[in-house]
Structure formats: structure tokens, C-alpha cells
Amino acid sequence: MIRQPFHLVEYSPWPLTSSIGAFTLAIGLASWFHNHGFLCLTLAAFLIIVSMIQWWRDVVREGTYMGHHTSLVTTGLRWGMILFITSEVMFFLAFFWAFFHSSLSPTPEIGCSWPPTGIHPLNPFSVPLLNTAVLLASGVTVTWAHHSLMSGKRIDATQALILTVCLGAYFTFLQAGEYMAAPFSIADSVYGTTFFVATGFHGLHVLIGSSFLAICLARTWSHHFSAGHHFGFEAAAWYWHFVDVVWICLYLCIYWWGS
């Protein structure tokens, strides 16, 4: 019989495979920027996706079917998620720092102006504004889902999560179309680099958050969550609100002020 409230995690290959996949992904991405290494990038992405699916499956099994996620374990998971989001905030602070460092004191190499000479920025009141409305609406629907879960309304929570995932997919579709129609590329001065790195990294977070919420949707449909025990969903909702806040900052700083 277990006489302590903590979950003693068993051996798992997924941290190792995820690390290998992330390392290979970085190498493949750098190679892809130089017009080769796409196969390496694809294999690394496949390894990461498989590792995520298997790791997520293990966590769901341990928490839902084996009962390892006690109140103390859940508290640890909460702090872990808070620290993870804090580390993500530091990522985006670095991108904003690079953007403002370049825009507030433009160098002669880019014409001593911002946007740089020859760069035609995107209209902040077209697709970017629509993307903002889409993400804000998704923040409302994920909050609706959370309150429905706490009230024991599983059907309402399921409907709200379906809307949230659809809005996340629509945002990704709009962002991809914006990238294809952009009159500049990632190689067009520091403006193009900071724009595509910052917004692209946010787009990656939208994909991850949409996957997170899709898993929560499947778990909600399968009766995995109760009114008092649904931290898996809470973590996804925290992450999604973080994605919303970052996008508002990106819109105001890069799309609106930066143009």
C-alpha cells in the first residue's frame, strides 16, 4: 500500500525522445533556412509529435485511471505550469527586446527609419485585426467552457471547447494566408526577421494550445473531468489566455505601432 501522497514517476522514454527531437528540430530548422535539411526537419517534427502523444497518454492514464494525481500532486502540477508559462514569457520578452532595440534606434544600414527603407508593412486594420477578434472570441469561449465544467454542464463545456478549437484553427489559417501574402520575407532586414520570428513563434504556441484544447475536448467528452477535478483543462485554459495576451502585445507593438 502507498503511504505517501506523491506520485513516484516510473521510467519513461518520452523525455529522452522529446529532447532528441527538439535538438534535431533546431538543426533541421537552421539547415532549412539555408535551403536544405527539410528531411531532418520533418523527421524531428514527427518524433516530437509522437513523443507528445505518447507522453500525454501516459499522463492521462496515471491521473484519470490510476488515481496518482492527488491534491498535493495537482499543486505541484499547478506550480509547474506557472513556471512553464513564466519561461515562455521570457522567450517573448527577448523577441520584443530585439524589436524595440531595432525600431527605437534604427541604424544607417536600414535607412535610419522604421519601418526600414523599402519595407511595406502589413495593414494592421485588415487581417491582423480580424485575428485579434478571433483570439479574443476564443478566450471568451474557453472561459465559458471552464465555468460550464465547474457547474457540471458537460455538454455546454464540450460545445464551448469545439468553438475554441475551431477559432484556433481559423486563426492559424488566417495567419498562414497573411504570411503567403506578405510583401516582405524573413530575410528582408531586421524588420522581416523580428516580425516573422515573433509572430511565427506565437503561431507555434497557437498550434500547441489548439492541440492541448483538442485533447481536453476528447477528455471532456469521455467524462474524464469533474466539477472539482479538472486541472488538465485549467492548464490548457491558462496557456490559451497567455497566448491571447501575447497576441494583443504583438498586435499593438509590431502590427500597429511598428507600421
Curated annotation (Swiss-Prot):
Belongs to the cytochrome c oxidase subunit 3 family. This is Cytochrome c oxidase subunit 3. Component of the cytochrome c oxidase (complex IV, CIV), a multisubunit enzyme composed of a catalytic core of 3 subunits and several supernumerary subunits. The complex exists as a monomer or a dimer and forms supercomplexes (SCs) in the inner mitochondrial membrane with ubiquinol-cytochrome c oxidoreductase (cytochrome b-c1 complex, complex III, CIII). It is an enzyme of class 7 (translocase). It comes from the Eukaryota. Its EC number is 7.1.1.9. PROSITE patterns: COX3. The lineage of its organism: Eukaryota, Metazoa, Spiralia, Lophotrochozoa, Annelida. It catalyses: 4 Fe(II)-[cytochrome c] + O2 + 8 H(+)(in) = 4 Fe(III)-[cytochrome c] + 2 H2O + 4 H(+)(out). It is found in: Mitochondrion inner membrane. The gene is COIII. GO terms for biological process: mitochondrial electron transport, cytochrome c to oxygen. Keywords: Membrane, Mitochondrion, Mitochondrion inner membrane, Translocase, Transmembrane, Transmembrane helix. The keyword Transmembrane applies. One of its GO terms (molecular function) is cytochrome-c oxidase activity. Coiled coil: none annotated. The chain crosses the membrane at residues 13-33, 36-56, 80-100, 125-145, 160-180, 195-215, 237-257. Its main location: mitochondrion.
